[in-house]
Amino acid sequence: MSLIASFTKKSKLNATIKQTAQARKSEGSTADGLFKAAYQGYAEVLHDDPLRADALYNWGFALLHQAKTKTGDEAVRLYQDAIDKFAFCMLINPNYLGAAINGGVAYMDLARLEKVKPDDKLYEMAKIQFEKANAIQAGTASYNLACIYGLRGDKDACLKALENARDKVTLPEAVEILNDPDLDIVKGQDWFVEFMEALNKKNEADEAENKADVASKAPEKKWKLVEKNADSEETITEQEAPAEDNPAEEAK
């Protein structure tokens, strides 16, 4: 951050602190308006600070993974702390993709830990985070959304999200999808079976096409043309092999 930008942000912060003090002395709608303006001021001060955003994201990422190793209240505290760090990161940089996705993951893990129902607020918050991720980069969190819709038994939304993930090439491997407990409710339904069968056929066709493409680009065999005379054998050049790999003059 340049000195000018730093000075500008400092001035903005001081003005916002004064606005907060004024809000505390006010009442009713006047106070609410001043508080709202102050919050916007704080957000503007924090906005576009890449280093701070990266630090918050990685802090949240560490908390998320530590939470996965804990149980009970300690895990809840760590998940909530991770969620707060990701939210703060996105306050600084609203387009921080990793914070959006992992914020949703943290909400889902917390929902599982607390064994809440699929329509609980925690799952809804996860859904909001995944939708933010998709708005930043289309399809990146479509599979995560499919998992939420799968838990809720929402066929149409789940299928649409799976198709979007497929089209954006963000689906996990088929075996991971089939083993995902979030999709247990829908796995036996005809539409899901048809989707997986079509996916497997597409993968097989893509694999066959890739193999054919590799084979067509493989280097042709080469052979050495050797000219023989009574006294010596001299290698003249290295040439591309003819269509029929049976050169009459090839040295034996």
Model-based region annotation:
Residues 48, 92, 134-136, 168:
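Structural marker of alpha-solenoid helical repeat scaffolds
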Residues 61-62, 100-109, 147-152, 172-198:
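TPR/TPR-like alpha-solenoid helical repeat scaffolds
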Residues 139-169:
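Sterile Alpha Motif
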